[in-house]
């Protein structure tokens, strides 16, 4: 799937970086917000547009760790190191120097939200921070949705559609 560099999901990365500024104190440098609807439409916002662009162009959503049908997920936190498709985790690390991540997953009736937090390869101890501060991460998710509500509303008007995989 090819998106124009002007598509909001790619052009909003600077705005996303501003929204995650409070995370800088913890050296969290990577954040994504994905909202996957049961009808197959999706929102994908990220601080790293080059990663999202490559992910879509390579059609990695066909095997992605958060790209199965939204009904298959539970409300939970999941470390990148525990995800089923480690090939994508390694690709993110090797090609974009992003690792040591965690997903906060929130399920509702018509969609599932995925908030990912990550950092660079030189910060493996961040995983301890995640595990000991899940409440902080949950509060940041709420903060992001409130502070980014206008961005999310704009994204709602440009949702992508692609098939969910069944793995």
Question: Which residues does each PLM region occupy?
Answer:
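Juxtadomain coupling helices with adjacent low-complexity linkers
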Residues: 1-16, 120-167
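Structured interaction and signal-relay segments at domain junctions
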Residues: 3-10, 18-96
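Short, flexible beta-strand-to-coil junctions
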Residues: 35-39, 107-108, 118-121
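Glycine-rich loops and low-complexity Gly/Arg-rich segments
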Residues: 56-61, 69-71, 102-106, 127-130, ...
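Helix-to-coil/beta transition segments that act as allosteric "coupling" elements at the rims
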Residues: 87-111
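Short glycine-/small-residue motifs
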Residues: 113-116
């Amino acid at each position: 799937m090819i998106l124009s560099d002007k598509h909001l999901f790619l052009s909003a990365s600077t705005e996303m970086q501003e929204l995650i500024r409070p995370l800088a104190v913890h050296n969290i440098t990577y954040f994504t917000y994905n909202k996957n609807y049961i009808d197959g439409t999706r929102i994908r916002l990220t601080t790293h547009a080059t990663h999202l662009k490559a992910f879509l162009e390579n059609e990695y959503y066909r095997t992605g760790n958060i790209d199965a049908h939204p009904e298959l997920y539970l409300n939970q936190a999941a470390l990148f190191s525990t995800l089923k498709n480690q090939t994508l985790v390694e690709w993110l690390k090797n090609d974009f120097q992003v690792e040591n991540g965690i997903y906060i997953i929130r399920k509702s009736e018509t969609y599932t939200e995925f908030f990912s937090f990550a950092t660079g390869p030189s910060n493996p101890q961040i995983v301890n921070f995640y595990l000991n501060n899940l409440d902080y991460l949950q509060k940041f998710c709420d903060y992001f949705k409130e502070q980014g509500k206008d961005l999310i509303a704009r994204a709602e008007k440009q949702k992508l559609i692609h098939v969910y995989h069944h793995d």
